[in-house]
Amino acid sequence: MMQELGLQRFSNDVVRLDLTPPSQTSSTSLSIDEEESTEAKIRRLISEHPVIIFSRSSCCMCHVMKRLLATIGVIPTVIELDDHEVSSLPTALQDEYSGGVSVVGPPPAVFIGRECVGGLESLVALHLSGQLVPKLVQVGALWV
């Protein structure tokens, strides 16, 4: 069943989704617009997911951010960026979603309910002030 969906499970509980186009005989297809700009992809991802983290696998702050959300009970969508992709995060887009929060700089950057919360420091501040859980409940990422 997993193979039919393009999923592979590895020994360390990692699941990989194969995004190669399906064969012509398949009745389902994955629509990927290769013409879509990086900015448009980012906008789409932000609008489709209640909690999304733009992360780097080599960043310890990204790991702490993911662990904090997991501890609360939220499974965020995580987009791992390579070093060359980090520069593709447009600052104008960050300004549009930030609500006045300065998020200029490298990831991690977390978006909750289409609003840029910022980096790890901002996320921890929300948590310590007691505002994070209600915000996650409001966007449907957490049920209490």
From Swiss-Prot:
InterPro entries: GlrX-like_pln_2, Glutaredoxin, Thioredoxin-like_sf. Disulfide bonds join C59-C62. Gene3D superfamilies: Glutaredoxin. PROSITE patterns: GLUTAREDOXIN_2. It is found in: Cytoplasm. Pfam families: Glutaredoxin. Residues 39-143 form the Glutaredoxin domain. One of its GO terms (cellular component) is cytoplasm. Keywords: Cytoplasm, Disulfide bond, Electron transport, Redox-active center, Transport. The keyword Translocase does not apply. Belongs to the glutaredoxin family. CC-type subfamily. NCBIfam families: GlrX-like_plant. Has a glutathione-disulfide oxidoreductase activity in the presence of NADPH and glutathione reductase. Reduces low molecular weight disulfides and proteins. This is Glutaredoxin-C6. It comes from Arabidopsis thaliana.
